[in-house]
Regions:
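Charged catalytic cores and adjacent phosphate/nucleic-acid-binding surfaces used
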Residues: 1-6, 13-19, 30-31, 44, ...
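Amphipathic coiled-coil/heptad-repeat helices and related helical stalk/stem segments
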Residues: 35-39, 65
Length: 144
């Protein structure tokens, strides 16, 4: 990331919190800039840490992988994608048939608690823990 200093009045505070959500500092470098790491490298690196990486708010007209690249290629290795408006899923699948192979998630994209909306989607996992959620997300649509 380029060493650009954050302007909290413009971009908001970038707080560093401990495991108990206590604020322990602030990140001074602006984190919303582009990185020099390719998408495929990010996906692979996240997988090395047993995480999952997926493109967010792909239905948005700006700052989304679809608005920037025009497509989501199988090459990236995504197993799911997130859309803001779950009602747009069928429309997106028609324009981008590859999406039918992915699990589609939807959330509020809220950056503040007061902006969160009522959930439009619930995932069904056998246990209430992170491993069950990651197992669910790591399976492509149609996998058992």
């Amino acid at each position: 990331m380029p060493p650009i200093k954050n302007k909290p009045s413009v971009f908001g505070e970038q707080l560093i919190c401990d495991e108990n959500d206590n604020v322990i500092g602030q990140e001074e470098i602006l984190l919303v800039t582009a990185s020099g790491i390719s998408t495929e490298k990010v996906v692979k690196k996240v997988a090395e840490y047993n995480g999952i990486c997926y493109p967010a708010h792909i239905d948005r007209s700006s700052f989304s992988i679809l608005s920037n690249l025009g497509t989501i290629d199988e090459y990236f290795g995504f197993k799911c994608a997130e859309i803001y408006d779950i009602l747009k899923e069928d429309e997106l699948n028609k324009k981008h048939p590859y999406l039918e192979k992915l699990k589609i998630l939807s959330d509020s994209d809220a950056h503040y608690l007061e902006n969160m909306r009522i959930p439009q989607q619930i995932i069904d996992v056998p246990e209430n823990n992170i491993n069950a959620i990651l197992d669910y997300l790591n399976k492509k649509e149609g996998d058992n």
